[in-house]
UniProtKB/Swiss-Prot annotation:
Family membership noted in the UniProt record: Belongs to the universal ribosomal protein uL29 family.
NCBIfam families: L29 (TIGR00012)
Name this polypeptide is given: Large ribosomal subunit protein uL29
Ribonucleoprotein among keywords: yes
UniProt-listed GO biological process terms: translation
GO molecular function: structural constituent of ribosome
Organism: Sinorhizobium fredii (strain NBRC 101917 / NGR234)
Record InterPro entries: Ribosomal_protein_uL29, Ribosomal_uL29, Ribosomal_uL29_CS, Ribosomal_uL29_sf
Keywords (A to Z) from UniProt: Ribonucleoprotein, Ribosomal protein
Gene Ontology cellular-component terms listed: cytosolic large ribosomal subunit
Length: 66
């Protein structure tokens, strides 16, 4: 997910997307532990998407306060 796409989302949409990604991250970790994971690079992609969403959500919150 690109940063521009994330910036276009509302606060509620950001929370929903974050919850979805965290669930996916959990499932990927579980698949890795059981040896069923096919694309190990997806773990890094999801981790970076989560960080991107958290960063932009924090920036939006700071802008709203200022």
């Amino acid at each position: 997910m690109k940063a521009a796409d994330v910036r276009a989302l509302s606060a509620d949409q950001l929370k929903e997307e974050l919850a979805k990604l965290k669930k996916e991250q959990f499932n990927l970790r579980f698949q890795k532990a059981t040896g069923q994971l096919e694309k190990s690079s997806r773990i890094d992609e999801v981790r970076k998407d989560i960080a991107r969403i958290k960063t932009i959500a924090r920036q939006k919150a700071a802008e709203a306060k200022a």
